[in-house]
């Protein structure tokens, strides 16, 4: 059996594509090091400059491990976006492919053939996946592409317009995964709240929630990547009322100043954002995550200060901050740019605010009893089990450490009542009270 080594870079949407490729390559032995791999695959990210640089570094690193008759495959967003340039500049690569042919990866390797189908690959209900990183949680991609026209984002130029999966296809996938023991699901897309708008249906997520709630084996679920102009009050109400979907609200705002929101072509206003966020915040046991961009063209010192003030006053649980990246094919590319030193200085300022906000969110749980799921061994070694709040996403929201002597027969994915005792060095420490 030949050995396969795969590196998945970028977002969890890329991870799903990688898992689809692993499903097509089930006849290979998956290895965790490239040294003895017969086939190496890099699923690249092409979103911002730092991601592009990481992708190229990874490709060149894996090329150094090539042996006689081994195959190096490069796929994903970077490849789709810079097809001609990369094929010319990377002679080390044996097979090039973009974002439309993940389900044909086995044939490409067999024939040692490049393949670039028009459009993106849209997952089908019978698509096989090898879920990685968890035995109880899975990401479910509900759409591809994006109809938004944000000034800074190049994704629509290589992913195309919104293409939603059929609800029946999604529900069939979830049902099949529950048969394999999966009970916790995160629904993802570039803009989840636009789901089914390409079919003329507004609030398609409400229809999806209705169907997921009928699946008894689903214990918990959440929706990531809401977009401010397509996330309705009705959708928020539906999530709050749902017995399956937790009150997890992930909505990147990118900025709060009205002038900046117009320049960035976000389609929303400060007033509308505050209205949505407040409704999310006051929901019982709600968890709010957002993302912001620092240094976009047009961001004056005064506009940046307004963002800082808002992030200081409004209580988010998690905030991801990104330095603006000048990307070809975007409106912002042609705008007057802000000096990199200014962007770095502003990013350092905002990160101090974020650190304080996140610490406050963690500390608010000390003394509380919350429901957690066991992930397995912790990042701190064998003395602790790692767990997460049932509300949190699997990978990005943190870890709760639990002494391994407190659970006689721990089951990964099992839900427990946990009392949070301490917050130490970005980690919560808790004790299991009972099986929930």
From Swiss-Prot:
Which residues participate in [4Fe-4S] cluster 1 binding?
11, 45, 77
Q: What is its EC number?
A: 2.8.4.4
* Keyword Ribonucleoprotein recorded: no
Question: Which keywords are on file for this protein?
Answer: 4Fe-4S, Cytoplasm, Iron, Iron-sulfur, Metal-binding, S-adenosyl-L-methionine, Transferase
Domain TRAM span(s) in chain numbering: 363-434
Q: Please provide one cellular component term from the Gene Ontology annotations of this protein.
A: cytosol
Q: Which GO terms describe its biological process?
A: tRNA modification
Q: Which InterPro entries match?
A: Elp3/MiaA/NifB-like_rSAM, Methylthiotransferase, Methylthiotransferase_CS, Methylthiotransferase_N, Methylthiotransferase_N_sf, Ribosomal_uS12_MeSTrfase_RimO, rSAM, rSAM_horseshoe
Occurrences of domain MTTase N-terminal (ranges) = 2-114
Entry-linked Pfam families? Radical_SAM, UPF0004
Q: What is its subcellular localisation?
A: Cytoplasm
What the protein does comes down to: Catalyzes the methylthiolation of an aspartic acid residue of ribosomal protein uS12.
**What is the name attached to this protein's record?**
Ribosomal protein uS12 methylthiotransferase RimO
Name of the gene this protein is made from: rimO
């Amino acid at each position: 059996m030949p050995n396969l080594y795969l590196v998945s870079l970028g977002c969890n949407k890329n991870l799903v594509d990688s898992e689809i490729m692993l499903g097509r390559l089930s006849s290979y032995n998956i290895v965790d090091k490239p040294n003895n791999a017969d086939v190496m695959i890099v699923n690249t990210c092409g979103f911002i400059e730092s991601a592009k640089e990481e992708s190229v570094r990874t490709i060149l690193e894996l090329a150094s491990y090539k042996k006689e008759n081994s195959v190096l495959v490069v796929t994903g967003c970077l490849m789709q976006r810079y097809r001609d340039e990369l094929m010319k500049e990377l002679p080390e690569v044996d097979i090039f492919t973009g974002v439309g042919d993940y389900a044909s990866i086995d044939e490409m390797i067999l024939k040692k053939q490049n393949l670039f189908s028009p459009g993106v690959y849209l997952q089908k209900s019978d698509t096989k996946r090898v879920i990685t990183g968890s035995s109880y949680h899975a990401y479910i991609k509900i759409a591809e592409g994006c109809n938004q026209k944000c000034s800074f984002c190049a994704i629509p130029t290589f992913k195309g317009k919104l293409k939603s999966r059929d609800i029946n296809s999604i529900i069939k996938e979830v049902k099949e995964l529950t048969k394999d023991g999966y009970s916790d699901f995160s629904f993802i897309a570039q803009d989840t709240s636009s789901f089914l708008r390409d079919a003329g249906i507004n609030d398609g997520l409400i229809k999806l929630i209705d169907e997921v709630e009928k699946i008894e084996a689903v214990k918990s679920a959440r929706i990531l990547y809401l977009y401010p102009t397509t996330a309705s009050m009705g959708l928020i109400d539906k999530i709050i009322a749902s017995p399956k979907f937790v009150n997890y609200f992930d909505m990147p705002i990118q900025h709060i100043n009205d002038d900046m929101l117009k320049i960035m072509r976000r389609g929303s206003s400060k007033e509308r954002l505050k209205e949505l966020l407040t409704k999310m915040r006051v929901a019982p046991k709600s968890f709010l995550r957002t993302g912001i961009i620092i240094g976009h063209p047009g961001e004056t010192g005064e506009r940046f200060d307004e963002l800082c003030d808002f992030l200081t006053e409004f209580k988010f649980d998690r905030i991801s901050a990104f330095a603006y990246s000048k990307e070809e094919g975007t409106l912002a590319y042609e705008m007057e740019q802000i000096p990199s030193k200014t962007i770095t200085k502003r990013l350092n300022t905002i990160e101090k605010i974020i650190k304080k906000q996140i610490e406050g969110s963690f500390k608010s749980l000390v003394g509380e009893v919350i429901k957690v799921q066991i992930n397995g061994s912790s990042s701190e070694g064998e003395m602790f089990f790692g767990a997460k709040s049932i509300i949190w996403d699997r990978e990005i929201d943190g870890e709760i450490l639990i002494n391994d002597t407190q659970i006689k027969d721990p089951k990964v994915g099992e839900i427990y009542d946990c009392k949070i005792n301490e917050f130490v060095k970005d980690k919560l420490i808790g004790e299991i009270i009972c099986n929930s």
